[in-house]
């Protein structure tokens, strides 16, 4: 993280060391440029691809284990973590994903990160049939918005929309829940 390295180096005073002082200032200058060029977003929105660990080739699996140990079990979960990293402090991440991350033990570390560091602003478990283009009981999904901030006592808004049998029914249920103050 460029910002963390920059903060660490800025905290170190090298003015008294003639050998390091000039190099230290050059490194700080480069890090300031890198920080300015690092893309961060106020809002990150995604419906990520799904690919379980068994579907990954050896190279992708190895990369996932090294770079996303908390979410390596599925590509969608890696997108969750990456999107949280792309959001600015106080920014939002809105996604629709498989709901397996909420229940399976392989996602326990991811859940812990979310629950301890990123308040759930809103969540709507959609269950199966959230997309008419995916027929039947193929995948159970959840839509959610997380904030990239630490608010341990924040209470989000939740709507349970698993009973609808089509996109239209779920949209109608959501509109009704919102109109009634999110009491679905």
PLM regions: where:
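Conserved Class I SAM-dependent methyltransferase catalytic core
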Residues: 50, 69-128, 144
